[in-house]
Amino acid sequence: MPHDIPVGRSVTVRVPASSANLGPGFDTLGLAVGLYDIVTVEVTASGLTVDVQGEGAGEVPLDGTHLVVRAIREGLRVAHADVPGLAVSCENAIPQSRGLGSSAAAAAAGVCAANALADNALTTDQVIQVVSSFEGHPDNAAASVLGGAVVSWTDTPVDGETAPQYHAIGVDVHPDIRATAFIPDFTASTNAVRRVLPSDVSHVDARFNVSRTAVMTVALRTNPELLWEGTRDRLHQPYRADALSVSAEWVNRLRNRGYAAYLSGAGPTIMVLSTEDLPAEIVDTASSEGLRVITLPIAGPIQVNRKELG
């Protein structure tokens, strides 16, 4: 039987954005970056209120269908806890539908808030499982929860199982590595961009990506000089180029100049991993073409603070 959480208990969550795939690691590699949503959840006597400021304000629902609310409720269900009512406030800095893990961050914030309200009844692995279930893959979800870089994988259901099992492990990131995001002023639908991918790929291309994914884990941990080689990909970015022509053009322009650029998640954001700031002329050119350029540190794990009334 679910236990009741007292009215007045509140939680504030600071959740980082994330960049998925990192080139070759499709649905596998993820990286938390220093752009944050802040979500505050308070247990109330009844009802539901939702307030959204910043990114997504005026665009996302303010009822029980809001992703943060759905994630809170699922987290509470799994933790065998219940609340009479909720007040949810979101201060969003992560752009929506830009390939920076906004939906994974929302799900992570909701589940981690629920877990804190429920006295941390869930393990980290359970949290990642619940958050990933909203996404269908754990790369962004695990990065927002664990921080740093992650290697993730999914066990698909077999006979007798009803749901995929999601897993992730953290990877230490070399302290000199930082990320620069080139964020276009248009959005991309993850589902639409996934639909352009082929159902089968060649063994040659699969082997190419397996090797580059392995290289990327070394580049991230100990050898940033390998970042350009480690971000090469043949499994998804070439197929998405027509649907994301501006992004594909910028990836090529940056890579031709020796920068480790790749399509962040399903795009349209382009991410560059480097150990130095990019030249001002690149930033100025991108800005003149309508891209917002932000240099971001590698982020730590989600931060959760709980308060009691009085």
Swiss-Prot record:
Annotated ATP binding sites: P95, Q96, S97, R98, G99, L100, G101, S102, S103, A104, A105
Assigned keywords, A-Z: Amino-acid biosynthesis, ATP-binding, Cytoplasm, Kinase, Nucleotide-binding, Threonine biosynthesis, Transferase
Matches recorded under PROSITE patterns: GHMP_KINASES_ATP (PS00627)
Pathway participation: Amino-acid biosynthesis; L-threonine biosynthesis; L-threonine from L-aspartate: step 4/5
GO terms under biological process: threonine biosynthetic process
Enzymatic reactions: L-homoserine + ATP = O-phospho-L-homoserine + ADP + H(+)
GO molecular function, one term: homoserine kinase activity
Family: Belongs to the GHMP kinase family. Homoserine kinase subfamily.
Function per UniProt: Catalyzes the ATP-dependent phosphorylation of L-homoserine to L-homoserine phosphate.
The protein's name in its UniProt record: Homoserine kinase
Organism: Corynebacterium kroppenstedtii (strain DSM 44385 / JCM 11950 / CIP 105744 / CCUG 35717)
